[in-house]
């Protein structure tokens, strides 16, 4: 999973070893205003069937429609696709066959800067050397020991943020952009 915070909005991208993807664009409801940056056809809540979203673990009857995040609810655009995104998966093993030891799988992602237009929040695109963005990188695995699904699903993340809900942008790690070549 990759979540990119844009202040008043954030995007979610998920993929699996088969290359199946899931993408959503979230806009905080307090930021969705007539004449605002998100008041465009791409984010028309009626034409695009936007859903109300409270958070990953706010699905109990008590919080489902109101959420528990201090900022409130988000509009979730499930039909949104990150502009120009490229992705590929490679499996070194046999998917869903526990009789064959796997070596692993890899994924390669390319998020074009121009596709981050609504996530830039006034920041330069591409970012300048030293700019800081909040981006969550995580991996979740559905395990079924003895045929029973383990919940919550085990997770590996770039930076631990002490809550299981990945929809808290203020907990995403700080990523500093750099013009330096890696390894130098």
Give the positions of each predicted feature.
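Structural preference for beta-rich elements and adjacent junctions enriched in aromatics
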Residues: 1-184
